Amino acid sequence: AIIHYIHDSRDDASIPNNIVWACFVDKWQNVWVGTDNGLSRLTTHTYYRYVSLDKITMSGEGNCLHAMLQTRNGEWWMGGTNGLIHFTRNAEGYQNVAWYKQNSSAFPLSHNRVRKIYEDHDGDVWICTDHGINFYDRSSRQMRNFIVYDKSGKYSTAWAYDILQDKKGRIWMGSYQGGVFVMDKAALLSGKTIADWHYSDKGKNALSGLHVGQMVMDGKGRIWVSTYTRLNCINPNNMKVVQVANSDVVNYLMADSKGNIWMGDNTSVTCYYAAGSVLGNSFSSKTWQIGDKVSTMC
């Protein structure tokens, strides 16, 4: 059954706003929802709890939340249009609160527009912004900013939209008008700025488009890349691209716990099964028509 949750001004337990940008399921199976008017928590699938940002940050500033993450060690990260908020929580309340923003002397960030927050296999946290990629240094609680280029210098991760680490430990970065960049993590952290691999919309091994919205890894380790109205699947062993499917608009892309890939567009949801065999550009899949736009899934 599908349950539709909406804001109701008469009900304190309803979600605070009907514009939902992000959702996240934590290790206790609570569902956290980021909206235009704050954060909600659905505890054990029974009700939402509204938490206003000022209760966490002790500030009257707002933040339209587009990305959320709880790390494996329990840290919380929330980012959107006004920087990045970090905190931990225990019985005494919210601890270690830091708000990373442009021009902040205490906690500077390369850009206030946060697109993605990601924890890699080593437990390191990466943040994609409209001015490159940031790496969180836990020892100093500061960010290191990276902008990666292709060998020609024409394309870069200046507008970074997504990041992930593959099973070989390499870092994959997707950017607006830049394509996909791949390089060794240690080399990136050492200061190297030229990608080992780069994918654009040109050449024989091209993506379907240059604007990369999202990237996810399936259960076989393949990297799925969304470019507006198409999906691409990259084999990490031979680095070959297969253009998978046409769609209305690829609004959201995610992998489930079994490694299947889920895609939401303006009218439907499609699941590409990780166990399916690849025959040309045909993948085993199933589509459900829902008749409305998919903004996020979790």
Regions found by a protein language model. Name each.
Residues 1-298:
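Carboxylate-rich, polar loop motifs that coordinate divalent cations or form catalytic acidic clusters
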